[in-house]
Design a protein with these regions (language model features):
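Arginine residue identity/basic-tract feature
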Residues: 5-7, 21, 37, 45, ...
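Extended aliphatic helical segments
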Residues: 15-18, 32-35, 44, 50, ...
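Alpha-helical interaction segments
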Residues: 18-19, 37, 51, 80-81, ...
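A short, structured beta-strand/loop element
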Residues: 28-68
Length: 102
């Protein structure tokens, strides 16, 4: 299903969370933490269920390099809520880890 709903939430100056999801079932989503450095937005962490509605991936990035995902299984709404909560509650640590790996 195409992701036809998008929200951009600015968490702090230069830090944004983008939430994309499909309207129809099965729900497909992507939740991405982005940070702006020197005028360019960089993906720091991404959560999605691109392979299966019940299979959820958390991708770390080392610089621009996407790392192998952490994979969990479960309900879409639970996974989306957990991803949003993880970003909202831990974005500064996630960004700091990404910056240290650059």
């Amino acid at each position: 299903m195409p992701k036809d709903r998008t929200r951009e939430l600015f968490i702090a100056p230069g830090v944004m969370m983008v939430i994309e999801r499909s309207s129809s079932h099965p729900i497909e989503y992507a939740i991405v933490l982005l940070v702006e450095r020197n005028g360019t937005w960089h993906t720091v962490r991404a959560f999605d269920n691109v392979h299966d509605p019940q299979e959820h991936h958390e991708h770390r990035y080392d610089g621009a390099e996407k790392q192998p995902p952490i994979v969990t299984h479960g309900a879409v709404n639970d996974a989306m809520y957990a991803a949003e909560a993880k970003i909202r509650g831990g974005w500064s640590d996630i960004v700091r880890s990404w910056e240290n790996a650059r």
